[in-house]
Every structure is written in C-alpha cells, then in structure tokens.
Amino acid sequence: MAFPTVSYSRDTPAGYPGMIATTEPHHIISMVVSGTSGNIPFGIGVLFDTAEDTVKLPTAIGKFAGVAVVDRTLPFANGEVYKPYDQISVMKNGSIWVTALVAVAQGDPVYMTPTGGFTNVANAAANPLIENAEWASVTSGVNQLARLRLGVTK
C-alpha cells in the first residue's frame, strides 16, 4: 500500500482580513455599528461613534476603537461586511490579519488611514499612530495580507 506524501510548512498559512491570526491572548468587544456608518468590511479599523457602545467606518481621523473581526454567522446576503445596526466584534488586543496598504516589516509602527486601512507610513494630518500596535509579519508590496498585533507592551 502506498502512503501519500505529506509535508507541512513551518509557516502559518495566510488567513483573510479580519481573521484572528494566532492563539495568543486576545480581547474582543461587542459593539453596534452606528446607523450613520457605512458598511464595515472585515479587517478594517473602526472608530468610536458618539453614542455609547457604537462604532463607525472612518471617514476622517477619530478615536480608534479596534479592528473588525470576521463573523461567519452573518447572513450570506450581507457579503463580507457589517451593516449599520449589526452587532460587530472589535479586536482591541491580539493578533489579526489585515491588508497592509504598503510593504511592511516586523516591528514597524502601525498607522490607520482615514478609510480604516493600515500602513506604516506616518502622516500626522491623515494617518494617526495606533498606540501599542506593530506589524507582526513582512510584506513585499502593496495591498498584501499581514498580521497586525494590537496591545503590544514594549
């Protein structure tokens, strides 16, 4: 009887935006998408809205709430987004897959763009620094999947 050839990579396989990246400790909170927010794609940074326990899709600089975590229990018709008034899971601390808008390196600082994307490019007028966050993987180009680590103690 022949045995199939099996091999395993030592690297974690790539995930998808909004997927929890590792089993390291993480903290996820439940919020509600503001009625005035646009649809929030998985893996996008969100801002606190003015009403208690609500978040919104960024349209300008605001107070960073966390990263939208994938929820596979949402109706298929929603697509891969949270809609206004949906309950949303927001990662505050831990490791999550996101799309890096530019090439990043491990340990680089993380900045959020006004549309909720993530970069390592500083721009005080448009890309605020996310405190205690760092890139946990390396990319070689634009719009590539990367691990973002929130709540880093240095």
Task: List the predicted regions and their residue ranges.
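Surface-exposed, low-hydrophobicity beta-strand/loop segments enriched in small/polar/acidic residues
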Residues: M1-K154
